[in-house]
């Protein structure tokens, strides 16, 4: 009898094959759900990283220009084959005795994020970020402080007084010629309108601001970050 009871206890312990299959199935379903949920989050995080990188590069350039009493350029470019990356390049203006101390640095954005103004963005002058352009040009600098100008410029220059201008000075003292240059740059994942971000620069002050697109009743609206 003792032997029979001992065997019975051994048979009752552990998991049966059916129970193990059920547990494995539950784990696989949970893992699949987690993977599907993580996909959109990772995509959004890459957009956030691109936005943060671009914003930081612009603020660094302005800070360098003020601290070193010279001019720094910031150039924006989408991917050019064979490179799959959009880039932001910060560089000291070369020439004269007041050349910046920092070397040229190029920042790469995540591969699925580019400088992009997608169809569906607000286009009215009262609805675009800080009133620059019409929401149709991805890299759109070259506007004066009151929103007048041609736009479409892809390079801006930060100057010793903190302002943003369209060209560096030519008198070799690090100054700028006084042509204030503001504008906006848009970033997004292609086909994902609500991933859109924007960064504006006010020419006369060099103020840099970030924006994010949100859906509202009847359309979309930019909100400052």
Task: Tell where the protein language model's regions lie, with residue ranges.
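N-terminal helix-rich module
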Residues: 2-15, 33-59, 63, 71, ...
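Alpha-helical hydrophobic helix detector
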Residues: 20-37
């Amino acid at each position: 009898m003792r032997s029979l009871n001992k065997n019975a206890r051994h048979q009752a312990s552990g998991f049966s094959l059916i129970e193990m299959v059920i547990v494995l199935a539950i784990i696989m379903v949970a893992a699949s759900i987690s993977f599907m949920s993580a996909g959109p989050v990772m995509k959004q995080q890459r957009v956030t990283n691109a936005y943060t990188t671009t914003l930081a590069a612009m603020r660094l350039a302005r800070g360098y220009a003020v601290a070193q009493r010279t001019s720094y350029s910031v150039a924006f470019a989408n991917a050019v084959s064979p490179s799959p990356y959009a880039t932001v390049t910060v560089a000291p203006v070369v020439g004269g005795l007041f050349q910046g101390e920092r070397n040229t640095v190029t920042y790469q954005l995540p591969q699925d994020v580019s400088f992009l103004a997608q169809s569906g963005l607000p286009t009215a002058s009262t609805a675009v970020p800080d009133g620059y352009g019409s929401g149709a040009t991805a890299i759109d600098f070259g506007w004066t402080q009151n929103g007048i100008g041609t736009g479409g410029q892809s390079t801006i220059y930060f100057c010793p007084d903190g302002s943003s201008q369209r060209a560096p000075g030519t008198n070799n003292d690090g100054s700028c010629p006084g042509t204030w240059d503001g504008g906006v740059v848009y970033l997004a994942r292609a086909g994902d309108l609500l991933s859109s971000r924007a960064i504006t620069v006010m020419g006369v002050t060099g103020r840099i601001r970030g924006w994010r697109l949100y859906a509202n009743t009847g359309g979309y609206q930019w909100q400052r970050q």
